[in-house]
Amino acid sequence: MVRLTIDKYLDKRGITRYELAKRTEVKFQTIDRYYKNRVVRYDSYILDRICSVLECDLCDIIEYVNDKD
């Protein structure tokens, strides 16, 4: 399963969801879903905006977890 780790990344850098929404120009509700890992289909545009604003790689905010464990 793919899991977003935006929450950990933002908390570590002291950035709020509101600030990220404002800087990415993405609706707060959308950023909140990504933050809470409640996204069914990932939007490459949104992931690109998040990575661009945070100056990070995709692998910094997303991880693969083997759900067979």
What kind of feature is each model-predicted range?
Residues 10, 21, 51:
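The alpha-helix within a helix-turn-helix
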Residues 27, 38, 65-68:
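The DNA-recognition helices of helix-turn-helix-type DNA-binding domains
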